[in-house]
């Protein structure tokens, strides 16, 4: 399984977004996106809901991201 941080980065790049634009879309700080993508911290449940909604709106698969998040929470 790919790391959660790597999957978040790939998802953002699939959407052709900068960290700044992705942060605005999720209503989080750029620093938060940077910490997620560099495995400094993981998204909380509220952020995961925002990520899921973003994926659904942009036709980006969410299953692998969700599985990686659940695995890291255990």
Feature-to-residue mapping (PLM):
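A detector for short, charged/polar N-terminal pre-domain segments
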Residues: 1-3, 70-71
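Short basic helix-loop element that most often maps to the first helix and adjoining turn
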Residues: 6-21, 50
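Secretory-pathway ectodomains
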Residues: 7-8, 27-28, 51-63
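Residue-level detection of the helix-turn-helix DNA-binding "recognition helix"
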Residues: 9, 13, 27, 38-40
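Short alpha-helical DNA-recognition segment
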Residues: 16-35
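Short, basic-rich loop-to-helix N-cap that marks the start of a DNA-contacting helix
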Residues: 40-53
């Amino acid at each position: 399984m790919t790391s959660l941080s790597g999957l978040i980065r790939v998802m953002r790049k699939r959407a052709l977004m900068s960290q700044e634009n992705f942060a605005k879309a999720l209503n989080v700080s750029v620093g938060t996106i940077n910490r997620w993508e560099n495995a400094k911290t993981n998204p909380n449940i509220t952020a995961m809901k925002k990520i899921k909604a973003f994926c659904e709106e942009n036709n980006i698969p969410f299953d692998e991201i969700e599985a990686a998040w659940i695995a890291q929470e255990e």
